[in-house]
Amino acid sequence: MLMPFRNEPFTNFETDAAREGMRLALEQVKQELGRTYPLVIGGKQIHTDDLSQSVNPARPDEIIGTFAKATTEHADQAVRAAHWVFDEWRHVPAAERANYLFRAAASMRRRKYEFAAWLVYEVSKSWVEADADVAEAIDFMEYYGREMLRLAAPQPVVLSLIHI
């Protein structure tokens, strides 16, 4: 049985354990900075010569990552790929779709410090702000998964008589 929705609690960085968890995540993420990321369309990686960089706003010389830029043709390919996948996805039951959201929320919850660390580097969030953004993302997945289940269930039909 699914528990009632409850907002993801914020991390209390006054505790040694929380500070250490965040410090370790920052070290881990720092080791991953500077990678190059291709486009991914229809599950296939596409490398382009036209690249752009994401930099740490607090340290503009620190490159977070380099990513392939898409063309109009790439956008068209992505729309076609999404349309093709939709033909299958639209038949996936709401409970299965909701389960994807719940599993993603659980994964993000387990890796909360890591996701927050990426926000610290990529957009110069403070630890508290980054933690709040990650908690909000978890809340969105939990809430909309529950809404999906609620809306997929039989709904009462309300008849009203309007007298003119």
What are these regions (language model features)?
Residues 60-152:
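Glycine-rich loop-to-alpha-helix module at the N-terminal edge of alpha/beta enzyme cores
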Residues 13, 42-44, 49, 67-70, ...:
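Surface-exposed loop/turn and secondary-structure junction residues enriched for glycine/proline
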